[in-house]
Amino acid sequence: IPLLTAIDQEGGKVNRLQAISPEWKNLPSAKEMRIMADDSVYNLAKLIGNALHHYGINLNLAPVLDPPKDSKGKPSFIEVSNRSFGEFETAVPKIRAFVQGMKESKVLSTSKHFPGYDSWTNSDHQIAFSTSSKDVILKNVELFKEFADEIPVIMLSSVRFVRLSNTPAVFNPKITAMAREISPYTVLLTDDLWGVSLRAWISGTDKVKGKNYPSKDFKKLIRTVLLAGNDMFMITYPAKAVEMIAYLEWLGKKYPEYRLRLEQAAARIIRLKYLSGIWKEN
């Protein structure tokens, strides 16, 4: 069964292609795509998608479906970073054009960061928090619902939505259940688990230093995201990915509850690969 090979190619500041060739520099951000014609967004996404496909990428960790305003009504971190497609009415046609362009190039899309990154700080370094009410959070979720049939993967946020729980969304079974309600077949993907803020949260400390992360904490991190309801785990440290796979295999063999979760996750991922044409039976 072929692998899902992913990259986050949003455009603007999040532009991985520019590391390959200078021709990909200065690609429009989501904020800039807001004022582009829908067919122009489609053609741009198709062009980028063709490049991704050429390099063996079949999953783009984009587009961003996060709101432009934070929980206080001010520009959010995502908006300030030019990564938001804007409010619902503006965002829908642009996001749809982006996703269709990628699909035409045989590249799947990912909606992120569920249930909507509406904080004003960067959660990569320290867990960001949102004080949005449940009603506002549910309003932000509407954009994810809009694309339930078009975007097969949802990435969970690392933000703490304190009106719902004190736990970061990616660790929170209640919030993953909200994502699951959108579609039982949607594949739920974590944010980067090697991120400093998520590792520090698991360890119960303010900071973690370098790569010397305690094994017991790393195992706790894996168990937490699995039982929270996530299907795919993203980690930007290849050696730890190997360690993670080995530990998941051990958990599945030893404990029925972990085996069930692993089988559920694997079934969703295999279904996605089959329906998208990534895996074709002979």
Positions of predicted regions on the chain:
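Glycine-rich anion/phosphate-binding loops
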Residues: 34-50, 89-92, 136
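Glycine-rich, aromatic-flanked loop segments that form ligand/cofactor-binding clefts
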Residues: 1-25, 45-69, 91-116
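Aromatic- and acidic-residue-enriched segments that line the glycan-binding/catalytic groove
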Residues: 15-28, 71-76, 129-132, 208
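Second-shell residues forming the walls of enzyme active-site clefts
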Residues: 93-257
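A charged helix-plus-loop insertion that forms the helical arch/lid used to bind
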Residues: 22-36, 81-84
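Mid-to-C-terminal alpha-helical segments outside catalytic/metal-binding sites
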Residues: 242, 253-282
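Divalent metal-coordination and catalytic microenvironments
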Residues: 8, 52, 154, 191, ...
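Short glycine/serine-rich loop/turn segments
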Residues: 60-85, 109-129
